[in-house]
Amino acid sequence: MIKKIAVLTSGGDAPGMNAAIRGVVRSALFEGLEVFGVYDGYYGLYHNKIKQLNRYSVSDVITRGGTFLGSARFPEFKNPEVRAKCAEILRSHGIDALVVIGGDGSYTGAKLLTEEHGIQCIGLPGTIDNDAPGTDYTIGYQTALETAVDAIDRLRDTSSSHQRISIVEIMGRHCSDLTINAALAGGCEYIVASEVEFDQEELIQQIERSIANGKRHAIIAITELITDVHELAKRIEERVHHETRATVLGHVQRGGSPCAFDRILASRMGVYAVDLLLQGKGGYCVGIQNEQLVHHDIIDAINNMRRSFKAELLDMNERLF
């Protein structure tokens, strides 16, 4: 029976992480467990940055963006000797189990701690990219989506005023959920998704046809890492003779107070993680599917439960414009 658990956040921060930490801490305390916070992710674990938490440690954090525990990239965790030291540090505090909030890279580290060292670990999906396996939604995605839509709405105002073409680059890496849904909600004329090969010439020809038909402004939503959006803006302006500007939303999408959906989702997942640990389960990741909380073996989720690309949403956007 576990008596002490720890919680850490790893990888890129996401709105709602604090709500998840709060869910873990207060539900664990309710069950009579001692709870410790690991500061600065796996890096902090390796450097023994661990502090005991109480219910007041998480007072008012549900409204705050980011993660008060801090986060850090720590590729050295792939080294078995580094993981062994981390497990030793956890045991030196009497910690039996660990909740890891982050993406699939964070999940893999948690699974290895469970398999190699018997530390019961549960992963919670904390990333704005909505690309974690085994879940319909990740903690932070909905807030980031609202941030992106708000930015698109503001760009629409100025683009229409100046008869300008605006390119907005949205985060997501290799998952375009943010881009596609923000574009649909914001009424963007064009979507460039990472899952579909980018044809620059086709895009420019579409814009030329729209302008010939009387279009006075347009917004292009594009997922990050596909192309240099500032260079793309120059090429479009040269071809269509319309002022074209690129806006990179960047890390502003990670910040801000989490929306109600993310606060509730994160709280539910935090409580569910503690329930799993009390059942003696480790090496699992938590998700929400069809509105129900679920858990999957981490490796099975990573290998077999990748999110499928919803091409029908792109098709729908073409029909709407």
Curated annotation (Swiss-Prot):
Q: Which Pfam families match?
A: PFK (PF00365)
The residues the record assigns to binding substrate are T127, I128, D129, R164, M171, G172, R173, E224, R245, H251, V252, Q253, R254
- UniProt catalytic activity: beta-D-fructose 6-phosphate + ATP = beta-D-fructose 1,6-bisphosphate + ADP + H(+)
Mechanisms controlling activity: Allosterically activated by ADP and other diphosphonucleosides, and allosterically inhibited by phosphoenolpyruvate.
EC number(s) recorded for this UniProt protein: 2.7.1.11
Pathway annotation: Carbohydrate degradation; glycolysis; D-glyceraldehyde 3-phosphate and glycerone phosphate from D-glucose: step 3/4
Q: Which cofactor does it need?
A: Mg(2+)
Positions annotated to bind ATP: G12, R73, F74, G103, D104, G105, S106
Sites binding ADP sit at: 22-26, 55-60, 156, 187-189, 215-217
Q: Name one GO molecular function term.
A: identical protein binding
Instruction: Give the residues annotated as active site.
Output: D129
> Which superkingdom, per the lineage?
Bacteria
Protein's cellular compartments? Cytoplasm
Free-text function comment from the UniProt entry: Catalyzes the phosphorylation of D-fructose 6-phosphate to fructose 1,6-bisphosphate by ATP, the first committing step of glycolysis.
Give the family from UniProt: Belongs to the phosphofructokinase type A (PFKA) family. ATP-dependent PFK group I subfamily. Prokaryotic clade 'B1' sub-subfamily.
Protein's name in the database: ATP-dependent 6-phosphofructokinase
Q: Give the species this sequence originates from.
A: Mannheimia succiniciproducens (strain KCTC 0769BP / MBEL55E)
